[in-house]
Each structure stands twice: as structure tokens, then as C-alpha cells.
């Protein structure tokens, strides 16, 4: 069975959680509903996926290469509500307290970092699960890359899952052709213009018939209806630019390694303190369950004379299995055990 990495679209999931969960504040008046919803989605995904690696990508305020290509890119988006904006740095702090690596790169969007990380994982034989509410990411779906799209209503989260065939079933085009659709129909949320007069239905029919905008343009005289033919003839340059804007970069300068992203213990004392400060009482129970399930630290017994050593060796010689470790640290030492409850340490001091 392949290893797996979970890659989360930070702003997208925060945004979904903010609008899906009623307003919450902590005792200090800080809004917390987006952070609370994000963590619930995170834990739900991790419980289901049993992944070995995790990373979260966030957008930065700086313009990206797409803004340089088209100044009006995302120009129609409304400003983020202040109640959500104040939760973004808190979310990053909580994730950092959990030891989760954050992916951010000036000049690139979170989508580009997620796409690059997912493709690198696929090439390394690691399955990737991308969690986002952004349908642009469907272009990345393969048999090794799954897109999971949470929807939270009244505090209840449901998740749609997409591998390559699921995209085809839902949209009648392949994942890579999602880009072609955007090139023709545009994307109002990102202010990608597309071709004026071509909507989703016509775009789907054209891509189903011709595969790409380039091939559609090569056969433009065959296109029906006439309105779509004239629109593509007159605005093909706009279609080409829109395609570039819609294409996720798979070669972003990302330095994340699998070791950086390896999942260890999210339930750290620092993360517990954040959840306590944010009044996330239900989530605190997760920390307590993890602590309760941890094995007790073994008792360490120092063996300091021959009599104790003889008793130890007499006990261990009858065991089917023992573990030992030989190490140098201020002298020569050997640790021996036949259980998880007790470890015996024998040092050269007193014997040599």
C-alpha cells in the first residue's frame, strides 16, 4: 500500500468553514468559527485518510505571475470580512503549534504550491489528497491524486471526492480539459474573462468535440452555433490568455521534503494551549484521548554492582526476546529490557 500525503488549501477551507459555521467568539471576543471549522475538517480528513504526511498552503498578499499577465485577475473579488481576516494569522499559529509545515511563496498562489507538491508526490509513488473548495484544482485529479471538496452546512461537513474518472462523470471532460473549459467560459470568481458569449454548456460541447481550444480554433468554421463560431474567431487571444490564467503551475519553487511533512504528534502542549485559549472544549477532548492512550514511560533501573548484574542476567536469559542498546555517553553503557515497563541500564562505572 502506498504512502499518502494530505495537502490542504488553507484560505479555501478557512473560507468554507467561516461561512458554514455560525459566528463563534472566545472569551476575549476573538472570532473563532473559521479556525474551529478548519480543525474539524482537518481531523475528519486525517481520521479517514490515515496519511503519513501533511502540509497546508496559503496565499500571500503579493501579486502573482497571473497578475502580471492580466492586471484585472481576481479584480472583482470582495474584500475578506474582518471577522475572517483576523482568524488567518491565528490559524497559521495553531498549525505551527501542531508542527504542520505551511507552504507559502511570493508570486505563486496556494493552488500552484498544492499542484507542485501533489505532482512531486505522485512521481515519488506517494498518493496525494488535496483538500479544497476550489474547483480549479479538479484539473489535478489522477488515479494517484484525489481532490476532496468539503461542504459545511449548519456545522455538518460533507465531502465530495474526485479522482480522474469522477471528474469525467461529473463534468463530461477530463481533468486537464477543466482548463479548456475555463479558457472558453471564463471564471467569474477569479475574473478570468474567457470568450464573451460562450457559457458552460457551449464550452462543454466544444471541448467534448474538439478536445482543446487550439483544436477548436483550427476547426472554427465547423463550429455551431454560429454565435459560438464568431465569438471564438473574434476573441481567440482572450481564450488563450484565459487558458494560461486557469492553468495551475506544477513547477513552483517548492522546497518541501517528505521528512518536513511527516505527520508526528499534532496534539502538542502548544496546540492544546491554543485550543484552550480559543475555547474549543470539544477539541480539547481529542488531546485528552491521545494522552490517555499513550503508554506509560518505562521505569529505568540503574545496575551498579555485580550482584545486581547477576540477578538481571539470570532473569533475562530465560526470556524469548530481549532488546538492548549499546552506546557511549560519558563512558560505555548498555540498556536492556524484556518489557515496555522497565529498562535496566548497566554502565562500565563500578565494573571496570
Where do the language-model regions lie?
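Noncatalytic, basic helical substrate-engagement surface that gates or grips nucleic-acid strands
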Residues: 1-131, 135-161, 238-255, 260
Amino acid at each position: 500500500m502506498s504512502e499518502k500525503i494530505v495537502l490542504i488549501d488553507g484560505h479555501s477551507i478557512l473560507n468554507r468553514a467561516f461561512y458554514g459555521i455560525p459566528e463563534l467568539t472566545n472569551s476575549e471576543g476573538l472570532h473563532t468559527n473559521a479556525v474551529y471549522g478548519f480543525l474539524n475538517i482537518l481531523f475528519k480528513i486525517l481520521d479517514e485518510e490515515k496519511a503519513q504526511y501533511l502540509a497546508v498552503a496559503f496565499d500571500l498578499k503579493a501579486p502573482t505571475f497571473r497578475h502580471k499577465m492580466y492586471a484585472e485577475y481576481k479584480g472583482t473579488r470582495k474584500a475578506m470580512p474582518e471577522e475572517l481576516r483576523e482568524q488567518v494569522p491565528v490559524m497559521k499559529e495553531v498549525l505551527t503549534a501542531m508542527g504542520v509545515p505551511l507552504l507559502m511563496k511570493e508570486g505563486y498562489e496556494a493552488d500552484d504550491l498544492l499542484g507542485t507538491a501533489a505532482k512531486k508526490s505522485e512521481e515519488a509513488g506517494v498518493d496525494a489528497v488535496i483538500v479544497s473548495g476550489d474547483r480549479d484544482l479538479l484539473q489535478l485529479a489522477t488515479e494517484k491524486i484525489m481532490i476532496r471538496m468539503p461542504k459545511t452546512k449548519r456545522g455538518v461537513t460533507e465531502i465530495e471526492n474526485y479522482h480522474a474518472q469522477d471528474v469525467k462523470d461529473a463534468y463530461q471532460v477530463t481533468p486537464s480539459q477543466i482548463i479548456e473549459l475555463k479558457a472558453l467560459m471564463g471564471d467569474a470568481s477569479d475574473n478570468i474573462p474567457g470568450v464573451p458569449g460562450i457559457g458552460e454548456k457551449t464550452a462543454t460541447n466544444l471541448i467534448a468535440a474538439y478536445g482543446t481550444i487550439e483544436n477548436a480554433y483550427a476547426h472554427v468554421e465547423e463550429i455551431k452555433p454560429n454565435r459560438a463560431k464568431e465569438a471564438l474567431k473574434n476573441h481567440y487571444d482572450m481564450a488563450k490568455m484565459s487558458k494560461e490564467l486557469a492553468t495551475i503551475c506544477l513547477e513552483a519553487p517548492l522546497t518541501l521534503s517528505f521528512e518536513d511533512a511527516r505527520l508526528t504528534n499534532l496534539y502538542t502542549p502548544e496546540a492544546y494551549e491554543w485550543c484552550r485559549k480559543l475555547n474549543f472544549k470539544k477539541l480539547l477532548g481529542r488531546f485528552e484521548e491521545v494522552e490517555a492512550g499513550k503508554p506509560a514511560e518505562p521505569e529505568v533501573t540503574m545496575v551498579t554492582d555485580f550482584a545486581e548484574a547477576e540477578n538481571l542476567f539470570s532473569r533475562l536469559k530465560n526470556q524469548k526476546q530481549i532488546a538492548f542498546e549499546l552506546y557511549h555517553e560519558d563512558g560505555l553503557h548498555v540498556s536492556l529490557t524484556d518489557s515496555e515497563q522497565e529498562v535496566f541500564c548497566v554502565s562500565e562505572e563500578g565494573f571496570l
